[in-house]
Regions:
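Extracytoplasmic "Venus flytrap"/periplasmic binding protein-like
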Residues: 64-139, 175-182, 272, 276-280, ...
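Short, low-complexity disordered leader/linker segments with a strong preference
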Residues: 1-46, 68, 435-446
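Extracytoplasmic/periplasmic solute-binding protein
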Residues: 146-159, 164, 185-235, 278
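Extracytoplasmic/periplasmic substrate-recognition and gating elements
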Residues: 176, 247, 251-257, 268, ...
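C-terminal capping/gating helix-and-loop segments adjacent to ligand/active sites or protein-protein/ligand interfaces
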Residues: 380-433
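Hinge/lid segment of periplasmic solute-binding proteins
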Residues: 108-163, 216, 301-303, 373
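A structural signal for short loop-to-beta-strand junctions that line the ligand-binding cleft
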Residues: 100-102, 132-171, 312-316, 391-399
Length: 446
């Protein structure tokens, strides 16, 4: 195994640059000022959709309803492709802030970057003084708080989240007289019994290509029951219980899964599941529409990953939470906040999440008909609302999180699947990089 690379210089440089942008923007005068104003509460505001295209239609519906309620406010809608949104925000900040929107879609994956550059207003007090107080799912609120890197303030209003889901073929389970995979014992038993390699039938399919580590983390923490990503200043990723869970997970490869899983990204994995004889798939709610379209509602079910053992609290790895941010440079924060509050209201939040197939953040949407008719979404919502559920907050606030958890280590994960690297060596390598990144981040907070 190659020596672990310390990421200190690159991480420090990244964060230092972000802090420099923040100081530069704050020092600006009226031209590009980031202080903004409350404004008249009417007139025109600009909204950047952080997934323009797929979500354009639903946002235009919500904007039309908002403008009907507030005829003195006009919303200028700007669709930003999801692949460009972070760079679009960064460019606007670096140019002084004048071109930033009043309101923007903000995901937790890049929230800390915007906070570090001083681009967003905190919204904690605004939530507390509005109809949203006490109406947002607590676990989503905590995910947003953790992702922003500030223990006290929220820098976006959560609107939706995804969640890891264990999808299974109810028709195959029924034919084999197997119980639902609602425990790890049932899961591993079904994976074995539904596999017939000679007949090209498999109990499970996993993700070995792009995005593989995120799904491995889901499986590790769900099985280990470890409820925090950090133990002091060190990650729990390399805890022996997580290493053991990873060993069980990778042992499935080629034993009960197709060999092609080695290079699966999510699209290949989902297509393989929907078009073959595969019993189970671990993905998220986003693939529900594909499953229904290709398999039919009577052949598919989805449940949250099982708790580590019977009677234990469920441990869920945090998924990125989408939200709406109030930009500090806005000259009409009063009108911008009206739009955020309206979009996050029970009716609008429900409408938006029904369209995109995600979990609504507003608890007032929980009893809506569409959720009752979508059992996987209902189960995910109930698990997030369960006070016993423990959400393992991933460190999206680390500048190098995406590098460490994706491209830099995905080739090493493939080596684990192929038996060329042990699960322990992999966990140790990633943990060392995360510990160094956390130490750098903390150093720059003081």
């Amino acid at each position: 195994m190659k020596p672990t690379r310390r990421r200190t210089p690159r991480t420090a440089t990244t964060l230092a640059a972000a802090l420099t942008f923040a100081l530069t923007a704050t020092a600006c005068g009226d031209n590009g000022s980031t202080t903004g104003e409350e404004g008249p509460g009417k007139g025109t505001i600009t909204f950047w959709d952080n997934n323009g295209g797929p979500r354009t239609k639903i946002w235009k519906q919500i904007i039309a309803k908002f403008e009907d309620k507030y005829p003195d406010i006009t919303v200028k809608y700007v669709p930003i492709p999801i692949t460009n949104v972070q760079s679009k925000y960064d460019t606007a900040i670096q140019s002084g802030g004048d071109s930033l929107p009043d309101v923007g879609g903000v995901g937790t994956a890049y929230l800390a970057n915007l906070v570090a550059q001083g681009a967003l207003d905190p919204v904690t007090d605004r939530i507390d003084d509005s109809a949203l107080k006490g109406k947002l799912i607590k676990n989503m609120v905590e995910s947003v708080r953790a992702a922003g890197g500030d223990d006290k303030e929220l820098y976006s209003v959560p609107t939706s989240a995804n969640q890891g889901t264990l999808w299974y073929r109810t028709d195959l389970f029924k034919a084999a007289k197997l119980p639902a995979p609602d425990s790890w014992e049932n899961f591993y038993k079904a994976a074995d019994e539904l596999t017939d390699r000679g007949g090209n039938k498999f109990g499970f399919t996993l993700r070995g290509g792009a995005g593989s580590i995120a799904q491995a983390l889901d499986m590790m923490y769900a099985q280990s029951g470890i409820s925090s990503f950090w133990d002091g200043d060190r990650t729990t990723l390399d805890d022996p219980r997580n290493v053991a869970a990873l060993e069980k997970y990778i042992a499935l490869f080629k034993k009960v899964t197709p060999a092609a899983d080695l290079n699966n990204d999510f699209a290949k994995m989902v297509a393989q599941f929907d078009q073959g004889d595969i019993g189970m798939l671990q993905h998220n709610l986003g693939s529900y529409v594909d499953h229904i379209r290709l398999l039919g509602k009577d052949k598919i079910a989805g449940i949250p990953l099982p708790p580590s053992r019977a009677g234990a609290a469920r441990t869920i790895v945090s998924n990125p939470v989408d939200g709406l941010g109030l930009f500090k440079a806005s000259k009409n924060k009063a009108a911008a906040w009206k739009f955020i509050e309206f979009a996050a209201s029970p009716e609008m939040n429900s409408l938006w999440n029904e369209d995109v197939g995600a979990i609504p953040a507003n608890v007032g949407a929980a009893d809506d008909d569409w959720i009752a008719k979508a059992p996987p979404t209902r189960a995910a919502l109930e698990s997030l609302n369960d006070p016993r559920t423990k959400v393992v907050q991933l460190p999206y606030y680390l500048p190098d999180w995406n590098n460490i958890s994706k491209a830099d280590n995905e080739p090493s994960f493939q080596k684990v699947l192929l038996g060329r690297l042990t699960a322990k060596a992999f966990c140790d390598k990633v943990a060392n990089e995360l510990n160094a990144a956390q130490a750098d981040w903390k150093k720059h907070q003081n």
